[in-house]
């Protein structure tokens, strides 16, 4: 399951004062998706009505359901609440100056879309669009180059079925108090990536309830964050539900390299990463 909505990142240009790494047009994301779309796995994709035909054409005959959705209409009130907090001086004053460029702190569209991942997966399950018991969320733009998928034709890795499988880029995540969770959010510390999550349908339903509770708590504390911070809170409240799978230090795109195939080479790669950390 994945999703793409054009939130105007093509206009986040450096000549307008934005950090250069933020600028990505809708066409850039479509190009990234072409790499992911080469997988033969069934896919459910949520997008806007105008992008639906283009995405269907890319998948070209592979088992795919593209669901058109107007997220601005459906999530209008929550988006307004996010925008209010992002403009609130009390919230802004908590952030370090260097964090102010990050879009989760100023773009309501970005914060909203990042926080809808579990909604999209559970909506796909509710609509009976998912044919397998194991379901993965993978970001639409996760595969920025063709070699990210490591030549896989079908992704079918034996993840722990009793857990929600997260993927981490830093070791040592400990969150003993909710204040520590909020501290991670405010300081934008990255442990868990938002780009991929794998679980059974049953665990996704359980996880969705937990995510919603964490999102509500975050907003009530006058804080906005993207999915990474919310997932840290989920880990704080229910660590037994979650398994942390290490990708290597800051190795955000190692998903298919370390958890792609069930062969000896992949096992040895993972062993190396666990020993030397990268």
Predicted segments with their positions:
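Short beta-strand-to-loop element that shapes/binds the nucleotide-sugar donor at the catalytic cleft/hinge
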Residues: 164-177
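N-terminal anchoring/stem segment of glycosyltransferases
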Residues: 1-104, 112, 116, 124-130
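Short secondary-structure boundary/capping segments
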Residues: 14-21, 60, 151-154, 182, ...
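Short catalytic/ligand-binding loop motif for oxyanion handling, primarily in non-cytosolic enzymes
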Residues: 8-11, 52-55, 74-77, 143-148, ...
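GT-A fold catalytic core of metal-dependent nucleotide-sugar glycosyltransferases
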Residues: 109, 113-167
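A structural signal for short, well-ordered beta-strand segments and their strand-loop junctions
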Residues: 1, 44-47, 134-139, 165-168, ...
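Non-catalytic accessory regions outside enzyme or core folds
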Residues: 1-15, 260-271, 275-278
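Catalytic core and acceptor-binding pocket of nucleotide-sugar-dependent glycosyltransferases
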Residues: 142-148, 185-274
